[in-house]
Amino acid sequence: MSKRLLKSGIIVSGMTLVSRMLGLVRDVVIAHLIGAGAAADVFLFANRIPNFLRRLFAEGAFSQAFVPVLAEYQKSGDLSKTREFIGKVSGTLGGLVSIVTLLAMVGSPVVAAIFGMGWFTDWLNDGPDAHKFEQASLLLKITFPYLWFVTFVALSGAILNTIGKFGVMSFSPVLLNIAMIATALFLAPRLDNPDLALAIGIFLGGLLQFLFQIPFLKKAGLLVKPKWAWHDEGVAKIRRLMIPALFGVSVSQINLLLDTVIASFLMTGSISWLYYSDRLLEFPLGLFGIAISTVILPTLARHHVNREDNSSQSAVDFRNTMDWGVRMILLLGVPAAIGIAVLAQPMLLVLFMRGSFTLTDVHAASYSLWAFNAGLLSFMLIKILANGYYARQDTKTPVKIGIIAMVSNMGFNVLAIPFSYVGLAIASAMSATLNAYLLYRGLAKEDVYHFSRKSAVFFLKVLGAALAMGGLVWYNCPSIQEWAAMTFLMRIYWLVWLIGLAAVVYLGVLVLLGVRKHHLLTKH
């Protein structure tokens, strides 16, 4: 089983890698086009709302609620009932999201006022940032339809994942990145406001993602006519699971939105610096954390469904799958966190310092990146640990934990006010760590999952190898002034060389410490 999980994880991570690489190219293009000034703040604000919704649906609450229920229908072996269930879910969900999308487009000034209070206050008082509020309202009208597209992308992706077709859903974000890069390069130069072109790119990217998945559903025989069925038993069950899951899974994203509200009161550039640092952190989070979480959820759901046939064995299989997921997060997340800590400024400089993005912006973004990075492992573990609840159709516990984490984040934000925008990143990292701890404590208390002794030994080996890697890379890394003086090709050479050195040292020390291939495959 774990060999199949590892293979699926590699497929998802491979597709995610392509998407994240294009995402970095997209961010490089955006940084060159609009830098980290007022235009960047407005566009990134308008982009954060649909981006939040993408994570909420495509990588979060909807899948967590839908997959376990779909697994029950699939276990019955009745394809016609499964198709009917999918049709009812798509029709009901589609109807609701259509209403929400239309209301949000019409009421975009209200949305902009809620999440950009600082700009709205300036608009009311004819302040210097009044134009930001007006532009944000316009861009939200263009970006909000992405919610409609991404809802069906999440639905079809979850269906395909349950039948082992993980690559389709993992590849679809590539289309969003291509659309945004294309509009930035070819449409933006023809418009007075380049951020308008980027907003159009988000709309087109959502449309392409939606159309891309249809042929795969049809081939699997699961493309069915949507039907409104609010009171259907299966739909009602998803609704009961999803409403709390919307909050529980997305606490970290809600915290980021709260950060955006506060950042709208801070100096120009704050939202942009937080965005670019968050984008670098999203690379390992998506490549490893979300990929592994996506792969193990259907397996965990099946183990839970099969508990009626063999309760004892299913519980063991469930626990082993959780432990395998945690070990994979440690294997990949620990060196990623240490690598980012050492190479934060060089990576920001190589990727973004051109055009309107200056060395000052590199320094500013690096501080928030270091702060966010302190919580990277927690952000990744949350994805795995939350599945331990949602696979068992327990959504109440994560909601309680989510409320605690969100309230704590607000308190941390207040305490971190003296640190300006960096304080927001510190607060997010602290609340994520609290969230992960409480999720684990709950699973352990219910005897669902305990961090095994084998995984503890594995963690110590990983930590030792990662520290050796980080120390050697830090010793060989040029100063930021030397990086700034290099040509672009020389910067690329040095960054690739240091990352290659890190990989060789990390893997070499792991082997010396006794880690072998079977440690990654077995869950027993």
PLM feature spans:
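Membrane-embedded alpha-helical bundles of multi-pass transporters/translocases
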Residues: 1-524
